[in-house]
Amino acid sequence: GLFDVVKGVLKGAGKNVAGSLLEQLKCKLSGGC
């Protein structure tokens, strides 16, 4: 239903945010920013 679609979108957005934060962290740790 509609709830499942919304949940899926939110999960995807959360993954994207977490992924970009991890990338920034890796970049800072390796000093390659």
From Swiss-Prot:
Top-level division of the source organism's lineage: Eukaryota
Tissue: Expressed by the skin glands.
Keyword Secreted: yes
Keywords: Amphibian defense peptide, Antibiotic, Antimicrobial, Disulfide bond, Secreted
A GO BP annotation: defense response to bacterium
InterPro entries per the UniProt record, alphabetical: Antimicrobial_frog_2
Cystine residue pairs: 27-33
GO cellular component: extracellular region
Localization in the cell: Secreted
Family, similarity comment: Belongs to the frog skin active peptide (FSAP) family. Brevinin subfamily.
Role noted for this protein: Antimicrobial peptide. Active against the Gram-positive bacterium S.aureus (MIC=30 uM) and the Gram-negative bacterium E.coli (MIC=30 uM).
Name of the protein in its database record: Brevinin-2DYb
